[in-house]
Regions:
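Amphipathic alpha-helical effector-binding/dimerization core
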Residues: 44, 53-56
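Canonical phosphoinositide-binding patch of PH/PH-like domains
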Residues: 122-124
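Short aromatic-glycine-enriched beta-strand elements
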Residues: 34-41, 105-112
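Glycine-centered tight beta-turn/hairpin loop motif at sheet-sheet or coil-to-beta transitions
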Residues: 45-47, 116-118
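Short, surface-exposed loop/turn motifs at beta-strand boundaries within globular domains
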Residues: 18-20, 34, 45
Length: 154
């Protein structure tokens, strides 16, 4: 927990969400289109970049500018996972990693994936989509920019 980050401290001790995937990052770019805007986020690992789509009103309300610290939220059902990276090329965001755990239910599976920086990504997939996944498998998680939620202190 970085002591210099008020956002990190508050979210760690008081913010609770149902989003299984939560990462700290910094805004590196934002366009100013009149309706839907695109925001580039550099995660705290210093290498992973995400594309986020938000409304112009959200961008204004959150005062998103370059250098602003944010908390990135992504619900597990919004993440797809594939063994073939070419399947993910149409998505705005792709993250490579290794499957570390699979909890197989009757209809859904929870898949945990280790990212290169050691953080965990969680996806819930229909059982049929997880049938060819096993622990130790190298995979690509992918999702579109409009699935990502940004939280920040204003």
């Amino acid at each position: 927990l970085p002591l210099y980050s008020l956002l990190a401290a508050i979210s760690r001790f008081s913010l609770q969400t149902s989003a299984r995937n939560q990462w700290f990052g910094t805004v590196t770019a934002r366009d100013h289109d009149p309706v839907q805007q695109h925001v580039a986020i550099l995660l705290a690992d210093g290498t992973t970049r995400l594309k986020v789509a938000i409304t112009a009103q959200s961008g204004k309300r959150l005062a998103l500018e370059e250098g602003k610290e944010v908390l990135v939220l992504l619900k597990a059902p919004w993440v797809n996972i594939t063994r073939d990276p070419t399947d993910a090329l149409q998505a705005d965001n792709q993250l490579q990693g290794v499957v570390t755990h699979i909890d197989r239910g009757d209809e859904q599976c929870e898949v945990l994936m280790a990212l290169p920086d050691g953080q965990t990504l969680c996806a819930t997939l229909p059982h049929a989509q997880a049938v060819n996944l096993e622990e130790g498998t190298e995979v690509t998680a992918y999702f579109n920019a409009d699935r990502v939620i940004i939280a920040t202190l204003c």
